[in-house]
Amino acid sequence: MTKFIFVTGGVVSSLGKGITASALGCLLKNRGLSVAIQKFDPYINIDPGTMSPYQHGEVFVTDDGAETDLDLGHYERFIDVPVSKNSNVTTGKIYWSVLNKERRGDYLGGTVQVIPHITNEIKERIYRVARENHPDIVITEIGGTVGDIESLPYLEAIRQMRSDIGRENVLYLHVTLIPYLNASGELKTKPTQHSVKELRGIGIQPNILVCRTEHAISEDMKEKLALFCDIDREAIIQMVDAKSIYEVPLNILEEGMDDIVLKILGLEAPPADMTDWRAMVDRINNPQSETEIAIVGKYVELPDAYLSVAEALRHAGIEHLAKVKIRWVNSEEIEGSSAAELLKGVSGILVPGGFGNRGIEGKIEAIRYARENKIPFLGICLGMQTAVIEFARNVCGMTNANSSEFDVDAPYPVIDLLPEQKEIEDKGGTMRLGISPVKLIESTLVSSIYQDEVIYERHRHRYEVNNQFRAELEKGGLKFSGTSPDGRLVEITEYPDHPWFVASQFHPEFKSRPYRSHPLFREFVKATLANR
């Protein structure tokens, strides 16, 4: 029977529940167990697709086209199992489903209530992941912090599951903070005690307590936590701040967390084989070279807005035994000064995805700087579209060329709305989303990089290269080296008269892994190392 692990958080938010769940999943998978993982987000939005990156960070896109929380990116990178639309559930989705059932008459005229209707729907979403994947273990992260009113239905649902399927099949793991007070030079356990007390008041007794801390926890403090929280001493796990998130699986392995999990759930499995993972972490900690790459965007004040892009660059650095230093450049600042001033000295320039007119001219200037100064360039989604606009304006002589997203009256709308998008008015969940095939053109840079004729990549966009201008752009020297299988949609552009200039409509960052970097990022970082 499938076992279920529930990860909750207390004291403060952003403690690293997602990393904890991912790291545990990594260990269990490396012990030969099959693992599925999901996250519940308590907000009422259906998904984060229409939320500002300043509010939520990046939107991670799955193969099946779900727009999800950035923690799902951590899940895939650590566990290397694809997540799906069932892997991220919001309160909005739960209530949407329940209300639709009520309208259909599924509840036979009964009064619809949080208990049992909402809690049953939550449990159904957990069981659905188990039915879909048939794993040995399902790990479910509960977003938010214990004590938040929004999280109460989820906590009640997972409390009920202990009775529904038997306590031997359920494990509760609570992540909490042990703050350090500089004034007294002490670690304090009281916030954690109160967090566990709050959780127990709901009816959940944690089996494992994961303590986030800046400093190591003494044995006496672990004994104190075990006593006051009624948790076995061996199940008090310290998680000291690490230099790299990829050290976390090794740290909790040293604490014996995986053994404790298997003991509580009554499972047997061989020890985790972390040989390759250790080698990867060793490469992170012992780089032999360094490269600096500028990420030019408009959300750079919050790096989480470009989390997968930054991680993909670091993954490529791992492969090349290089430290990738990221220079975050606000594209709006380029508009007010000069690209040369803000980009001087970088070995590569990357323009990631985004939406809206703000900062666009700065991105275009950054791309021009990369093209004219032969600096390796990688554009992603909007980064490809702005690369086409820059080329049209400054090489092909199309004065004021633009995207119809930014200027509906542009004389040269080299980027235009996808035909199937023109009748769509709703914003949420209506873009071209998920994995699609890309046909590569022979004898191009990208065909040599991928070593394949057809690749499969994840997308999230409404706009495309306007086919009306393709011939003129190609005449100017731009190469459309990847298209949809029918040739209608441009997927990749490159500029042969440049050491390394590639841009993709898709998002390659979503398929990068720390031990298997994405080909485009791998070769981009390689080019930047040669350009130092």
Curated annotation (Swiss-Prot):
Q: What cellular component terms from Gene Ontology apply here?
A: cytosol
Q: In which pathway does it act?
A: Pyrimidine metabolism; CTP biosynthesis via de novo pathway; CTP from UDP: step 2/2
- What keywords appear on the UniProt entry? ATP-binding, Glutamine amidotransferase, Ligase, Magnesium, Metal-binding, Nucleotide-binding, Pyrimidine biosynthesis
Q: Where does this protein hold ATP?
A: 14-19, 71
Its UniProt entry gives the catalysed reaction(s) as:
UTP + L-glutamine + ATP + H2O = CTP + L-glutamate + ADP + phosphate + 2 H(+); L-glutamine + H2O = L-glutamate + NH4(+); UTP + NH4(+) + ATP = CTP + ADP + phosphate + 2 H(+)
- Any GO molecular function: ATP binding
Q: Where is the active site?
A: 381, 507, 509
In the record, biological process GO terms are: 'de novo' CTP biosynthetic process; pyrimidine nucleobase biosynthetic process
Assembly and binders? Homotetramer.
Per the record, the similarity remark reads:
Belongs to the CTP synthase family.
Add the further remark from the entry: CTPSs have evolved a hybrid strategy for distinguishing between UTP and CTP. The overlapping regions of the product feedback inhibitory and substrate sites recognize a common feature in both compounds, the triphosphate moiety. To differentiate isosteric substrate and product pyrimidine rings, an additional pocket far from the expected kinase/ligase catalytic site, specifically recognizes the cytosine and ribose portions of the product inhibitor.
* Name this polypeptide is given: CTP synthase
Species, as recorded? Desulfitobacterium hafniense (strain Y51)
